[in-house]
Every structure is written in C-alpha cells, then in structure tokens.
C-alpha cells in the first residue's frame, strides 16, 4: 500500500494540532491548568475525535485544549520536539510542520517571537535524536484579524531563515484572503513560498484569490475546486498542489462521508494532490491511516497511491537537490 521505494511525506500537518494526550495531562498539572477530566484515561475523549463524531465546533474545542496547556516557552519547545519524534515514529521521511505562534501564545500571553524561537529550538533538538527531515511553515491566523496577523508575521519573519513557507489559515468566510494581500507581499519579498487554506469553507473564488493575489503555489484542502471546471483546469496546468486531508475533512464536516470526498475527482482531472494528516493529534491518526483510508474508502489502486506519494515529494517546499536526496535515501 505504501511504496517503500518512494519517500513518505506529510506536507499539511499542524504542529499545534498534534499535542500528545499525556503531554496535555502533564503540562496541565505542572502549570495548575484545570483540565476537563480527572484522569489521563478519561482525558482522551475531550482532546481527540472519538468514533464518527463530526462537527467543526467540537473539532476546534479539542484543538483549543492542545494550545491551552502551552503555559511557557519550555512547553512550546517540548511540543515541537515531540512533533519531530511523532513524525519519525510514524515512518515519515519528510514532514512540513506548520504552526501559528499567535494562537499558541494567546492563552498565556507568551511573546510571539519567543514562541517561534521555542518551536525552532524544539525541532532542532528533535532532529538530533530522530532520523527524519523537517521543515517549518509559519501560519497567519486570519480569524484574529489583520492587526494580529501583522504581529504574527513580524514574529515569524524574525526567524525567516528557519522557515520554508507561510500559510493563511482560520476563518475563511469571515476573513477573506484579500484582507491579507499586504501581509503576503511581505512574505513574497522575504523569498518564502506560500500555501493557503482555501476552498474549504468558502467557494472556488477563495482559491483563485489565494493563487492570483496571495501567490499560493499550494492549497490546503481546496475541496470546493471541483465545482469550477476552469479552476480545475488551471490547477492541473500550473501544477498547483492540493494538500488533501480526507479524515480531517470528515471530522470537520467539510465532507459528509469518505464517499463524498473529491480526492478521486482531482486525480482524474490530473491535478497534483497528496495525502496529509492535518491535525493528527486531534484526529488520532497518522499518515499510514490516511493511506489505508485512500485505498479502502477512496478506492485508490496501489499504483495511484504510489503516484500520490510521488506527488507529495514534487509538491514539497524543497530544492531539487533535497528532493533527489530523499529519493536516494530510499535506495
């Protein structure tokens, strides 16, 4: 199912959406933070999706618990370190970990630049102990408004040498992409790549805007592109990558069922698309789960799954030499 001769990657993976249950428990107790359960065993249902529970509100509430225990910069560094460990232990050869320093900082009023530095330090420490390649993507969380995103951008750009790209995430309907055109001009001026959450809650126009105005060369989720034939043609022609996260889309009610997921439609249209975990801590999944789902529920053949793996390597924010090195390590 997973082709071991091809690098296994996860490109849409939120660091702040992957905090271990035991880490939430330990940090909560360490910092005197009230948790919704009185034992480690009973905490899981409050911070991870259980069974077929699918609602965006329930999903986001679980995500809030993950950042709610980030009471100091040591906690941030620990979570970053554990993200590297989790990526390696799930069999990934390469992962791009994205994070919103404003979101991670806000509960306990941490310094945004300090959060970025703690993430960088935690990842560096993890890379000393685990054999996996990691790059970082900074997120601007649109839900908090333009001014907050300016603060976030400045904190991230202070450490731009440790980032490969910037992302726009959050409330796509309430805060459309055009509000952040100036922010992403600064991102382009900093020579960082751009991806954006688009076409998830809003329609295809949100994706057009992200590509044409923000400068996105990849789109997170993008499920609503399938209703716009011209956009589908454009995505295929210009090799705009779709970072697909089927289980997350189910958990947030972006799609009603796996059978309704448009992954197959993208593939048949020749669009560059890959598989990702999104918030693996909340969804309680790993990349292997997504490949199993792609085979059993999305009905992809082994040959198609191998193509999806190759797509991920092509889509990655890597140099050609780094891509070749990933393949060489699999021989």
UniProtKB/Swiss-Prot annotation:
One example GO MF annotation: adenosine deaminase activity
UniProt cross-references to Pfam families, sorted A to Z: A_deaminase (PF00962)
Residues binding substrate: 14, 16, 170, 279
Active-site residues, record numbering mapped to chain: 200 (proton donor)
Key words, A-Z: Hydrolase, Metal-binding, Nucleotide metabolism, Zinc
Catalytic activity entry: adenosine + H2O + H(+) = inosine + NH4(+); 2'-deoxyadenosine + H2O + H(+) = 2'-deoxyinosine + NH4(+)
Site entry: Important for catalytic activity: 221
EC number: 3.5.4.4
Biological process annotations from GO: adenosine catabolic process; hypoxanthine salvage; inosine biosynthetic process; nucleotide metabolic process; purine ribonucleoside monophosphate biosynthetic process
InterPro entries, A to Z: A_deaminase (IPR028893), A_deaminase_dom (IPR001365), Ado/ade_deaminase (IPR006330), Metal_Hydrolase (IPR032466)
Family membership: Belongs to the metallo-dependent hydrolases superfamily. Adenosine and AMP deaminases family. Adenosine deaminase subfamily.
Function: Catalyzes the hydrolytic deamination of adenosine and 2-deoxyadenosine.
The name this protein goes by in its record: Adenosine deaminase
Organism of provenance: Shewanella baltica (strain OS195)
Organism lineage: Bacteria, Pseudomonadati, Pseudomonadota, Gammaproteobacteria, Alteromonadales
